[in-house]
């Protein structure tokens, strides 16, 4: 059985690392290069790096910072934020990044996924979905760092992304972001069991037990977390960590 992955998810804002709660209240937690050096030592599976301002502010990716990060990273990187064209993706790949995560741009022009996949392969494209539960209980997809309701169901959009050519889906629960009270297992399983590409679940990890619970209750392929690997203790002191994934009793 293929071991399921455990992936740190780092958020970039103004060249610094931040952590949010429900996509709000970004708190500075350190320098990205220092964090990556620590994760190198801990031999993490891979790394997801998301610029939370780029798409919302209609900015291009920060290629200089991406190059610095890629130069330090010993593990595969997935980068997202501000990628709106094939040329943006091509530039990022040329800097040594293995995957790009496309979110808002795909909602504006789904053909971007196919163009990137056709040129670089589906394995290089991750379709990112930010979703929030509505008043009546259903979930809706949001764009522009969770500020715009696209009035689409996460499952419908996940299937559209799969058909367009993504190699993976990154499913991020806005409601659970930074709360550290467990994943929305029902949401994750609904998506993971109805698409044929790997799904990475993000949003809610507060303990190793939460990771194990998600893996045991769903068919998700990987889990991503931020707060779990950045904060320590009830006062949320900044302390970068990573579990011994070989001790996670899951396949």
Swiss-Prot record:
Changing residue 22 to R: In strain: Serotype O16. GO terms for biological process: L-histidine biosynthetic process; O antigen biosynthetic process. InterPro entries: Aldolase_TIM (IPR013785), Glycosyl_amidation-assoc_WbuZ (IPR020021), His_biosynth (IPR006062), HisF (IPR004651), IGPS_HisA/HisF (IPR050064), RibuloseP-bd_barrel (IPR011060). Heterodimer of HisH and HisF. Belongs to the HisA/HisF family. Its main location: cytoplasm. The active site is at residue 130. It catalyses: 5-[(5-phospho-1-deoxy-D-ribulos-1-ylimino)methylamino]-1-(5-phospho-beta-D-ribosyl)imidazole-4-carboxamide + L-glutamine = D-erythro-1-(imidazol-4-yl)glycerol 3-phosphate + 5-amino-1-(5-phospho-beta-D-ribosyl)imidazole-4-carboxamide + L-glutamate + H(+). This is Putative imidazole glycerol phosphate synthase subunit hisF2. IGPS catalyzes the conversion of PRFAR and glutamine to IGP, AICAR and glutamate. The HisF subunit catalyzes the cyclization activity that produces IGP and AICAR from PRFAR using the ammonia provided by the HisH subunit. It comes from Pseudomonas aeruginosa (strain ATCC 15692 / DSM 22644 / CIP 104116 / JCM 14847 / LMG 12228 / 1C / PRS 101 / PAO1). Changing residue 134 to S: In strain: Serotype O16. One of its GO terms (cellular component) is cytoplasm. Its EC number is 4.3.2.10.
């Amino acid at each position: 059985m293929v071991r399921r992955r455990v992936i740190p998810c780092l958020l970039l804002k103004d060249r610094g690392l931040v952590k949010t709660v429900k996509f709000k209240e970004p708190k500075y937690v350190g320098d990205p290069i220092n964090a990556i050096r620590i994760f190198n030592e801990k031999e993490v599976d891979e790394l997801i790096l998301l610029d939370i301002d780029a798409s919302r502010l209609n900015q291009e990716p920060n290629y200089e910072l991406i190059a610095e990060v890629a130069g330090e990273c010993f593990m595969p990187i997935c980068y997202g934020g501000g990628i709106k064209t094939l040329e943006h993706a091509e530039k990022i790949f040329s800097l040594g990044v293995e995957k790009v995560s496309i979110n808002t741009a795909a909602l504006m022009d789904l053909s971007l996924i196919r163009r990137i996949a056709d040129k670089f392969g589906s394995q290089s494209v991750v379709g990112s979905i930010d979703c929030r539960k509505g008043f009546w209980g259903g979930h809706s997809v949001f764009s522009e760092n969770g500020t715009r309701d696209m009035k689409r169901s996460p499952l419908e959009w996940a299937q559209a992304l799969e058909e367009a050519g993504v190699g993976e889906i990154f499913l991020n629960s806005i409601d659970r972001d930074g709360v550290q009270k467990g994943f929305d297992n029902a949401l994750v399983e609904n998506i993971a069991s109805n698409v044929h590409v790997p799904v990475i679940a993000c949003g809610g990890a507060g303990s190793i037990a939460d990771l194990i619970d998600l893996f045991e209750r769903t068919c998700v392929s990987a889990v991503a977390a931020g707060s779990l690997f950045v904060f320590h203790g009830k006062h949320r002191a900044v302390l970068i960590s990573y579990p011994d994934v070989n001790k996670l009793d899951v396949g």
